[in-house]
Amino acid sequence: IRDRLRSRGLGDVYKRQVATILHCEMNGLELPEGYGILHHEEGIDILPANIELSGVEVSLVNVMSREYVLKQFIKTISPEYDYILIDNMPSLGMLTVNALAAADSVIIPVMAHYLPVKGLEQLMQTIYKVRKQINRKLQIDGILLTMVDRRTNFSKEIIELLHDNYGEYINIFKTAIPFSIRAAETSAEGVSIYKHDPKGRVAEAYKKLVEEVIGDGSERK
């Protein structure tokens, strides 16, 4: 993957990670404007992360106002963007709390498997706790089903279980992201699903999801 980044002119800045930026925020160090932000050829900006981010979690324990470190950084760049997406690891640690503290709203992706659905309850408790104690404006946009294979009874049972347990009080998006090998290939290729498989089912599903989440965008700006 690093070779592909170099071929796109991104190799030299790949070492500039979210971890570096958060460490600077924790220590009150200033960074050059736009530090670490990669301008992708498909028209979006990306701030990458790697395994070093795990070490940040340990460092956050002893930091004053540790829940707001990510929010402090996002404040410095938010005027430049209409939307900022924070992609979290499946974890309930301090990094996730930082993301929830910085966010306006949450989309909860859940794979159509038993264990992810089972773990959803703990995540919901974390979200409600953050909303009560840290970020009162935090909203839940909805639950997004991913890697769905509607050909199997198992997927159908998981979807039914999710609707039974959460459908009455949390929005479950009508759009579900189907399972696709072509979609799994995009990470290795370093391109989006719209470039790798623009006419595929996954690309079409994400287009529908965008329409479902933001419509024409007027209510979100």
Where are the regions that the model predicts?
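P-loop NTP-binding core
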Residues: 2-221
